[in-house]
Amino acid sequence: MYSNIELFTMIAIIVLLTKPLGTYMYNIFEYKPMRSDKIFLPVENFIYKITGINPEEEMDWKKYALTFLLVNMVMMIITYFILRVQQFLPLNPTGAKNMESSLAFNTVISFMTNTNLQHYAGEDGITFLSQMIVIVFLMFTSAASGLVTAAAIMRGLSKKTTNLGNFYADFVRITVRLLLPISMLATLILVWQGVPQTFAGKVVVDTLEGGKQTIITGPVAVLESIKHLGTNGGGFFGANSSHPFENPTWLTNMIEMLLMMLLPTSLIYTYGLMINNKKHALVLYISLFVIFILLAVGAVYAENHPGVAYSKLHIYGKPYGNYEGKEVRFGVSQSPLFATVTTAFTTGSVDSMHDSYTPLGGAVPLILMMLNTIFGGDGAGLQNIIMYTILTVFLTGLMVGRTPEYLGRKIETKEIKLIALAILVHPFLILFSSALTVMLKVGASSVTNPLYHGLTQVLYEFSSAAANNGSEFAGFIGNTVFMNIMTGLVMFFGRYITIILMLAVAGSMAEKIPAPPSPGTFRTDNAIFGAIFIAVVLIVGALTFFPAVILGPISEFLSMT
């Protein structure tokens, strides 16, 4: 009962914030005059001046995509070398060593792609300086990269020009006007609730037993805010948001979930304003929340009713649920709700150990990452939603014998080939990598559980990497050379191939002259379209991943009953 109240309270707050924040992002993307210009314009102009950026330069989709890639590659190279020499740099109170080459490769790709898959423990694997100028820096820039490429795609679908904007100007504006202000406010709230923000490093305390204990602190709050606002997910500590210094109270737990949901939901309203069709955006908004609520309720129910196998242990049962791997302060209801939010919005932070969930409870976050469309992360999620929207319109047009049109522009062979390729990249990366891992001894050695749960561990690892989520079944051994390279490549291709293909779709659609709606135009702003959209998302996901899910969590569930 409590979890349902929390779920719908959280959704109500997000719904109230969607319109004002969505409008604000629209004004940022469209360069509208704002009252805050007197604060932000001088900062932006200073950045343009010292970097030599010309914010008036126009870019077509090819130049926008190339600039996006080059900027991201440069940031990855610089941060890679910082991690490789971090022990020789200042602000290293914990004595962290230089990061091993394959782990550094995995880490910089992980954070630059907004995945934040962590094969290291933050307490001793990385310095305070690296936390700030590598981890936090990439958390801001990866979120900004996703948001501005989404803005470029929205312009391509809504404008009568092939100019998709200026990557540099978009990047600066979204960072200065959106990510930094909200992160600063969230940081202050988290500090108020007890999250550390200090350079003190180690604190040695006397325990009740008379011994000594070393407690690691650090600049945690500033990381924690952008970690969730930017749908990043990487933790300052190895235990992530289950650690009391990252997530000390039920209020911080709620705030972190709200931060994860804030930008992806509001971006759908921004999309409605950009295409001048708020009803269409509302249909997408409701459709996605329908799927999200059903899966959230399912996850909470599965963890509260763990089944016969748990009841026989005489420590679990209907009154208590599955407490294994969960923090007592969050319990068996808040934990799966957090797991649903973190995988639906591709953040990847965890306040409980997903590897300890029941088979069906663990299947929910796995399915959300496989679908990779239920809101998703900052910017990248909207791109996937648009991808499935165009596919839905195309399939519907084929069924009724009409030429498919979206926003007045015909969907032709070129666009649908690009869309099909973008959709296929995600399952190919997951299934091929999972199959290769279980076939090779060097990969199978990372699996720590037999039979069905072991396969689920592998599927979860690569689903998380391909979806740019970053959460893990923590029992899986990720920090090996093979897994660092494999997941690094999956994260890289899962991020950049899809974004570039969607920019190409936007560029192709921008070249077409939009036609006014006719009586034969399939409407995308009613309940019929919403139902078909849900069906397409679920059917495509089911057909692609159903055999693997059957062999993993569903078989494990059946074996326990």
Curated annotation (Swiss-Prot):
Q: A single GO molecular function, which one?
A: P-type potassium transmembrane transporter activity
Decide whether keyword ATP-binding is in the record: no
* The entry's keywords: Cell membrane, Ion transport, Membrane, Potassium, Potassium transport, Transmembrane, Transmembrane helix, Transport
Segments spanning the bilayer are 5-25, 63-83, 103-122, 133-153, 179-199, 255-275, 281-301, 380-400, 418-438, 485-505, 531-551
Q: Name one Pfam family in it.
A: KdpA
Where is it localised?
Cell membrane
- What HAMAP family does the record point to? KdpA
Biological role: Part of the high-affinity ATP-driven potassium transport (or Kdp) system, which catalyzes the hydrolysis of ATP coupled with the electrogenic transport of potassium into the cytoplasm. This subunit binds the extracellular potassium ions and delivers the ions to the membrane domain of KdpB through an intramembrane tunnel.
NCBIfam families linked to this entry: kdpA
Q: Which family does it belong to?
A: Belongs to the KdpA family.
State what protein this is by name. Potassium-transporting ATPase potassium-binding subunit
Q: Which organism is it from?
A: Caldanaerobacter subterraneus subsp. tengcongensis (strain DSM 15242 / JCM 11007 / NBRC 100824 / MB4)
Whichever gene encodes this chain, its name is: kdpA
